[in-house]
């Protein structure tokens, strides 16, 4: 797992924990912040996955052109 993907997973977990704690305590602001952090981290993970897929496709094309 890449460093970026690991960081995204950890950030998702932290955001989810904040969101859950906010729900339990009734702290709507903390709940919202946690949700936002979790969502941003998931977006970063998806972007990293897309980058990896594009790099893999480019490498495959380069191999075929050799």
From Swiss-Prot:
One Pfam family from the record: CsbD
Regions that span the bilayer: none
Location of region: Disordered: 1-22
InterPro entries hit by this protein: CsbD (IPR008462), YjbJ_sf (IPR036629)
Family: Belongs to the UPF0337 (CsbD) family.
Protein name per the record: UPF0337 protein SAG0619
